[in-house]
Structure formats: structure tokens, C-alpha cells
Design a protein with these regions (language model features):
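Flexible loop residues that form catalytic
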Residues: 81, 94, 162, 241, ...
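Conserved loop/turn motif of beta-propeller repeat scaffolds
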Residues: 25-27, 73-74
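Structured core elements
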Residues: 20, 30-31, 77-78, 123, ...
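Alpha-helix termination/capping residues and helix-transition junctions
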Residues: 23, 35, 43, 83, ...
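Cap/lid segment of the alpha/beta-hydrolase catalytic domain
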Residues: 106-234, 241-242, 276
């Protein structure tokens, strides 16, 4: 199917290994479209070429991959989340909206909507080269039971997503709300190379940008928000998992003076070792991200990988750093964390490491999730407040 509507050209239907639309009838289909880092639901009339958004952002601003199913000519199921709605299975009926309902939520926890901070989509223009837009979502602190003392700015946690060809949207995330309800601002950095902003932005990290542009983007946002008086200049931290962990280490080697602390989860510290031991699916991914188009000889490749590996630049890290890693991680082997911790410890730096037995790459087991949150909050309390 090839549908061209002029008014839809600014939106993206593409999503890797996912079906982003479902025909309901001969004249109507439902689609999940991407724009400014989020994915929204629309209904499209194929006969009149008209379309409209089905739900507001509070209900649906993120749609899971390959997660729509037709029920009838007018109704369908979808897995989605909104700015104040957790990930849920929902039923929508485009002809009878009063029959829309939530079938099941991913969590049984319920909190008053007044407690939730909503993400503000943010775009700044880089000051560094190449000149480019940089995107993010910013959640400011919110808790109706507490007010910050006058003149006090909140500390900021910058979170870099994994991938690196991925993104973070503005859907409700209770981990984010955990920190915003405790007085922290949180920035989800959709650095150069993220999805959700068009092909040019997505491809801009390839062929030599990884480890430089994404790290620069974090520093640009830290400086921007501090200069604008929105966050505490000496209370900014960086964190991320997987490629976001790599970003964390790169940021601390390049811009340590800007960041009060870092938390690296399942991150890469030495690219050559990683390239030789990661799983088959991503075995050529690093080369495409790091090497110029057309390739280079082995000596140049080895030199470039070393330049982009935090393990060889630990002397630049002045900020406290905690590394979390699963012992059974098959994507980024645990030695990536232990090598980094050993080298920093030998230099007398403030470093901690937690290796979780029986855990893999994504830290998904409930005990690991709890320990991760505890270690993170402990670090921020010590370094940001």
C-alpha cells in the first residue's frame, strides 16, 4: 500500500520491524505516526483523504511497536501510553467514542494526576559544529505537597536513551515521576541520531558521529538549561543504559566539569573489545556508527576506536561515577564495567561498581530494577543536593 496525503508528509509512519497501520475497512485505516519524538494515533479516511488524531496526548502519545489489532470496521485494540496514562491495552471505537475503554494497565499502582509532571518538548540549536537542532523532553519537579525554597533551582538528571538509534517519548514513566516528585528535573535527551525527528536527524550520527555528537548534545543542553536559570548549574548529572551508558562515559571524559556525577548502566568503555564480543545481531553496528563512509584500514580503525573509548581517557573524569552491570550481559560484557572501575580506582577517583548476578543487558528483573533505583537515588542525593 502506498498512500500519499500532502498533510501527512511531516509525519513519519516508518518503524523498524513494526506494522504502524491497520486497515479497519475499505475506506478507513488506523495509523501510528511519529512527530517530535512521540507517536500518536490517527484515523485516515482513504476516500476523502482526511485524517484526525484519535486521542489527546494525556491518553495516547506513545504507541508500542507492532501493537495494533483490528476488532471490527470501527474498532481496534492498541498498546499505548499517554502523558498521564501508563502503558495499557486500550479499545477504541472511531464511530462510538463513548465505548472507548482501558482493557488492562501495565501497573496496578494508581496516583493522583496532580502528582504527575508532564514532559515539555524542547529543541535548541547547537552552538558547536555542525550546527544542528537538538531535541529532548524536560520534566520539571512537581509535587503538590512540597514547594522548593524561594530562589532554589532544581538539580537536573539528563538521561540518554539506548540504541543509539532510538528515542524517549513523553509517555508516563513512573521512574521519571519518582524523581520529579522528589524535587529533581529530568531531561530525556533525544540526541543526534535519535528516531522520531525524520531521516536526516536519524542518520546524522552514522559514519563517525557516535561518541562525539551525542556527548556534545548532552553538554549543550546542560549549559542551555543552566544559563536559562531553569536548573542548578552545579547540580547536573548524566545517566543512561546501553548506548546511553556509553554516552554517559563519553560525556564525563569530554565535559566532566559540567557534570556533578554520572551513573553508567550496561555501558561500553572499550570499543575494540566490545566490537569483538557483542552478539551477532549488532556485530556491524559500531563500525557503521564510528567509521567514515567507505571504511578505513585496520590501523586507522584501531586508533579511532581508542579515541572514542572512555577507558583510555579516565584521567579526564573528575566527577563521581557509579557503574551498574549484569554479570550475564551478552550484549555488552561485564568486563566493560570492571575494567573501567579498576582503572578509576587505581587513580584514586570516586567510583563505585555494582555487578548483578543472573542479570542480562536490560536490567529487567524486579530485584535489579529496585537495586538500580536505590543506587541511583543514593548517588544523586550525595552529589546533586
Amino acid at each position: 500500500m502506498h498512500v500519499i496525503f500532502e498533510t501527512l508528509q511531516r509525519l513519519s509512519l516508518a518503524r523498524v520491524i513494526s506494522c504502524t497501520y491497520v486497515p479497519l475497512s475499505n475506506n478507513a485505516l488506523i495509523a501510528s505516526v511519529g512527530h517530535d519524538g512521540d507517536r500518536r494515533l490517527i484515523t485516515v479516511n482513504l476516500k476523502t483523504k482526511e485524517w484526525h488524531q484519535i486521542a489527546d496526548d494525556d491518553d495516547v502519545c506513545q504507541v508500542s511497536g507492532d501493537a495494533m489489532a483490528r476488532l471490527s470496521d470501527t474498532s481496534f485494540l492498541v498498546v499505548s501510553s499517554g502523558t498521564t496514562t501508563p502503558t495499557s491495552i486500550r479499545k477504541f471505537d472511531v464511530a462510538r467514542p463513548h465505548e472507548d475503554k482501558v482493557i488492562r494497565k501495565a501497573t496496578d499502582e494508581s496516583y493522583p494526576p496532580t502528582l504527575y509532571s508532564k514532559g515539555e518538548h524542547f529543541t535548541i540549536q547547537s552552538k558547536g559544529s555542525p550546527s544542528r537542532p537538538i531535541h529532548a523532553f524536560l520534566w520539571m519537579p512537581r509535587n503538590p505537597d512540597f514547594t522548593a525554597p524561594e530562589g532554589h533551582l532544581p538539580p537536573l538528571i539528563i538521561n540518554a536513551h539506548g540504541g543509539p538509534t532510538g528515542r524517549t517519548g513523553s509517555g508516563l514513566d513512573l521512574r521519571t515521576q519518582y524523581f520529579t516528585s522528589r524535587g529533581y528535573a529530568l531531561l530525556a535527551l533525544n540526541y543526534t541520531g535519535s528516531t522520531g525527528y525524520g531521516r536526516a536527524y536519524r542518520n546524522a550520527l552514522f559514519h563517525g558521529g557516535w561518541g562525539v555528537l551525542d556527548a556534545d548534545d548532552a553538554a549543550e543542553f546542560a549549559q542551555h538549561l543552566a544559563s536559562a536559570g531553569r536548573v542548578k548549574a552545579d547540580g547536573i548529572a548524566i545517566t543512561g543504559i546501553s548506548a546511553g551508558g556509553y554516552n554517559t562515559l563519553q560525556v564525563l571524559t569530554r565535559y566532566s566539569s559540567l557534570f556533578a556525577a554520572g551513573l553508567c548502566v550496561s555501558g561500553i568503555s572499550e570499543l575494540e573489545r566490545f566490537d569483538g564480543k557483542t552478539h551477532k545481531l549488532e556485530s556491524d553496528y559500531s563500525a557503521k556508527l564510528l567509521l567514515p563512509q567507505g571504511g578505513v584500514d585496520d590501523d586507522v580503525k584501531r586508533k579511532l576506536y581508542r579515541e572514542r573509548s572512555a577507558l583510555y581517557h579516565v584521567e579526564s573524569i573528575k566527577s563521581p561515577l557509579v557503574l551498574l552491570h549484569g554479570r550475564d550481559d551478552s550484549v555488552v560484557p561485564v568486563e566493560q564495567a570492571t575494567l573501567m572501575a579498576d582503572k578509576l580506582r587505581d587513580m584514586g577517583r570516586d567510583v563505585g561498581i555494582v555487578v548483578m548476578d543472573g542479570e542480562g543487558h536490560m536490567m529487567a528483573q524486579p530485584p535489579s530494577v529496585r537495586l538500580w533505583l536505590e543506587e541511583e537515588e543514593k548517588l544523586w542525593r550525595r552529589t546533586l543536593l
